[in-house]
């Protein structure tokens, strides 16, 4: 039963959120004031999260998908002992632990970075997917070593975003029973009344996806909220609980209006609101000891007991299933097996394969040595070569399966991969055509902001796609991805560069990787293995030509590298000194020492030509004012791939002409 102390705690969370925003003179008080009861009920009665043991693997995950309500999350983290009160006073200030929207790895207790609406919801599907897969893989009768929930607090805006439709469809199809969404249904959006833009039947929508739907008519009724969460945890399939709330609850002049969504209440309205709560408006950032004690005696006590029981269970599990236990411990550590490279292929001279196919070969090898390797494609596995051969598909019936069928849901796939990476225990990946990377670009950006070990496979990387035409031929995508900070964008030139690219992807603990791969075949370059290994890791290196300072530099990535080598050989026949540089990863190259960069691209050599079947954006930094860029300023065309490539000037003859014109 709930009592007056519980109501005091709820109102304290509201007041803390208000004061946090007032001091910053910036923020969104409406959601915290309306949603505090459901958050309080969840945290004190259900959530297994221990601020004193934040890395406890079997903890429940809480995601504030409506990231603009961050003041509520920070207030919860404070009263539960995870965040100092001083940090609330520094909300949205330089160097604080309380940024405007929650940030993963910045504030303890934040599971994923949220703010762009819909993505938190979709990443939560990834969190629940990770739990389901790991449970299916490691749990044995009497030993549920993976057994936790993912709880989401979502807003109207989250459910309007297209990604929520993709993610909800996927979650329902896969019966992710450990996913519970609390929907803060307050009928107000930033611009005004919600019914001006949003009138769908939430119950019908989610039941059509295969979700359970529950309704709490009064968002201040702690008992009803508690009952709904309890019911949700006992049902098969994901559950959404629509909780009807009043935005800005307690504010006499702003409650129920968009005026309280994204602006401080102001001093006068704050005073009136505190009086409505029965709190002293003269006291700021005030938390009574009895509120702290509530969290100590409920949430923290429960979490400590849960972790203690889990540790004991894990010890017994290790005795009964020693090999599985070792694999589990390695998985949750995030580390790779020491022998993970043992099965990786070496591609010999004379091998001629598309980098997507060579990547597929690498994937088969990784799956044998990295048990935590898990992912799939957005309905293009046959083209992306991304499935693990002879492996079981992931499904609600076979959650231990390795191949995920994401369906044509690119954005949700990207967010789900991020969620899986943030969850831990997996090295996740997702795959689609490169031109469709635009569909999941915001997820790539969040992956980079969070610094996740996530891999994105993008195949069919250029106009060489051919017949499908300009809608399916990437042009501006490469420059767009390279512009994302903290993103490894690797476009390998052959099978061996592809192998090392995968090594980089798996080993990059705080940088996501985009692998950009060809449809067409590429010859293996005549470069020693150790040179390829070091060169790809450093982002650029010499693959052909003069070790001395050359007269000409040919710079390229991916499929154009072998073309540059052909041109270089002809130039050498004409007595010219040429060096060909493969530049698979600009991000890595820019992190190298000036000495290394100078050794690869000598500043004294001004006669430079860059060759890439994509937008020229970015290449001028490397070719300089005296150099030239053979690239594409328009869109592609529909015709056989070889003909399209020729028509756009990616021929040995054109390269020679451009070089000789310098």
Swiss-Prot record:
Q: Family, per the entry?
A: Belongs to the transketolase family.
Please give an example of a GO cellular component term from this record.
cytosol
The UniProt entry, under SMART domains, shows: Transket_pyr
Which SUPFAM superfamilies does the entry mention? Thiamin diphosphate-binding fold (THDP-binding) (SSF52518), TK C-terminal domain-like (SSF52922)
Reaction(s) catalysed (UniProt annotation): D-sedoheptulose 7-phosphate + D-glyceraldehyde 3-phosphate = aldehydo-D-ribose 5-phosphate + D-xylulose 5-phosphate
Which pathway does the record list? Answer: Carbohydrate biosynthesis; Calvin cycle; Carbohydrate degradation; pentose phosphate pathway
- Which major enzyme category is it? transferase
Q: What is this protein called?
A: Transketolase
Positions bound to substrate: 28, 261, 356, 383, 460, 468, 519
Q: What EC number(s) are associated with this protein in UniProt?
A: 2.2.1.1
Name the PROSITE patterns on file: TRANSKETOLASE_1 (PS00801), TRANSKETOLASE_2 (PS00802)
Q: What does this protein do?
A: Catalyzes the transfer of a two-carbon ketol group from a ketose donor to an aldose acceptor, via a covalent intermediate with the cofactor thiamine pyrophosphate.
The record's note on quaternary structure and interaction partners says:
Homodimer.
The record describes how the cofactor is bound as: Binds 1 Mg(2+) ion per subunit. Can also utilize other divalent metal cations, such as Ca(2+), Mn(2+) and Co(2+).
Query: Does the record carry DNA-binding as a key word?
Result: no
**InterPro entries in the record:** THDP-binding (IPR029061), Transketo_C/PFOR_II (IPR009014), Transketolase-like_C_2 (IPR055152), Transketolase-like_Pyr-bd (IPR005475), Transketolase_bac-like (IPR005478), Transketolase_BS (IPR020826), Transketolase_CS (IPR049557), Transketolase_fam (IPR033247)
Which Pfam families does this chain map to? Transket_pyr, Transketolase_C_1, Transketolase_N
Residues involved in thiamine diphosphate binding:
68, 115-117, 157, 186, 261, 436
**Per the UniProt entry, what is one GO biological process?**
pentose-phosphate shunt
- Residues annotated as the enzyme's active site: 410
Q: Which GO terms describe its molecular function?
A: metal ion binding; transketolase activity
Q: Per the record, where is site Important for catalytic activity?
A: 28, 261
Which superkingdom heads the taxonomic lineage of this protein's source? Bacteria
Positions that bind Mg(2+)? 156, 186, 188
């Amino acid at each position: 039963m709930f009592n007056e102390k519980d109501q005091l705690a709820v109102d304290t969370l509201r007041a803390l959120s208000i004061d946090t925003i007032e001091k910053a003179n910036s923020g969104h008080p409406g959601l915290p004031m309306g949603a505090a009861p459901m958050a309080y009920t969840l945290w004190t009665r259900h959530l297994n999260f221990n601020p004193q043991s934040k890395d406890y693997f079997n903890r429940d995950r809480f995601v504030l998908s409506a990231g603009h309500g961050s003041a509520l999350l920070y207030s919860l983290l404070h009263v539960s002992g995870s965040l100092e009160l001083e940090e609330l006073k520094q909300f949205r200030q330089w160097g604080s632990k309380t940024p405007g929207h929650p940030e993963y790895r910045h504030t303890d207790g934040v599971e994923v970075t949220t703010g762009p609406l819909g993505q938190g919801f979709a990443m939560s599907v990834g969190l629940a997917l990770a739990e389901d897969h790991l449970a299916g893989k490691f749990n044995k009768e009497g030993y549920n070593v993976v057994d936790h929930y993912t709880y989401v607090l979502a807003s109207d805006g989250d459910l309007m975003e297209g990604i929520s439709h993709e993610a909800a469809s996927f979650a329902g199809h896969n019966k992710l029973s450990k996913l519970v969404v609390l929907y803060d249904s307050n009928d107000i959006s930033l611009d005004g009344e919600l019914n001006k833009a949003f009138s769908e039947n939430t119950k019908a929508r989610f039941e059509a996806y295969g979700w359970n739907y529950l309704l709490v008519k009064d968002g201040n009724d702690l008992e009803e909220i508690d009952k709904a969460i309890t019911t949700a945890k006992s049902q098969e399939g994901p559950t959404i609980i629509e909780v009807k709330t009043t935005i800005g609850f307690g504010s006499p002049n702003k409650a129920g209006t968009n005026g309280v969504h994204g602006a401080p209440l102001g001093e006068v309205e704050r005073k009136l609101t505190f009086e409505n709560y029965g709190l002293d408006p003269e006291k700021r950032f005030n938390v009574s000891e009895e509120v702290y004690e509530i969290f100590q005696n409920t949430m923290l006590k429960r979490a400590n007991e849960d972790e203690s029981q889990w540790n004991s269970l894990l010890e017994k599990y290790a005795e009964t299933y020693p090999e599985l236990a070792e694999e589990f411990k390695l998985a949750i550590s995030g580390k790779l097996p020491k022998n993970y490279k043992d099965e990786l292929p070496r591609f010999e001279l004379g091998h001629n394969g598309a980098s997507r196919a060579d990547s597929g070969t690498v994937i088969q090898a990784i799956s044998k040595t990295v048990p935590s390797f898990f992912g799939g494609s957005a309905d293009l596995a046959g083209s992306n070569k991304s499935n693990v051969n002879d492996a079981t598909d992931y499904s609600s019936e076979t959650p231990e399966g390795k191949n995920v069928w994401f369906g044509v849901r690119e954005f949700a796939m990207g967010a789900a991969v991020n969620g899986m990476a943030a969850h831990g225990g997996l090295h996740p990946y997702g795959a689609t055509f490169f031109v469709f990377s635009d569909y999941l670009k915001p997820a790539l950006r969040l992956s980079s902001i969070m610094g996740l070990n996530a891999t994105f496979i993008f195949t069919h990387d250029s106009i060489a796609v051919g017949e499908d035409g300009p809608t399916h031929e990437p042009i501006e995508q490469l420059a767009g991805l390279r512009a994302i900070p903290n993103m490894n964008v690797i476009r390998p030139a052959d099978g061996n560069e592809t192998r090392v690219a995968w090594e980089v992807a798996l080993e990059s603990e705080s940088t996501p990787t985009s692998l950009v791969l060809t449809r067409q075949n590429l010859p293996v370059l005549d470069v020693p293995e150790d040179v390829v290994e070091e060169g790809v890791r450093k982002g650029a290196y010499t693959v052909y030509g003069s070790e001395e300072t050359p007269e000409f530099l040919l710079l390229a990535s991916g499929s154009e590298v072998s073309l540059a080598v052909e041109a270089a050989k002809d130039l050498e026949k004409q007595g010219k000194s040429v060096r060909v540089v493969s530049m698979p990863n600009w991000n890595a190259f820019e992190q190298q020492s000036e000495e290394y960069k100078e050794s690869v691209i000598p500043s004294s050599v001004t006669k430079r030509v860059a060759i890439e079947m994509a937008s020229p954006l970015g290449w001028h930094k490397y070719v300089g004012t005296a150099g030239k860029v053979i690239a594409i300023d328009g869109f592609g065309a529909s015709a056989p791939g070889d003909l399209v490539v020729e028509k756009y000037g990616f021929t040995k003859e054109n390269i020679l002409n451009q070089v000789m014109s310098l």
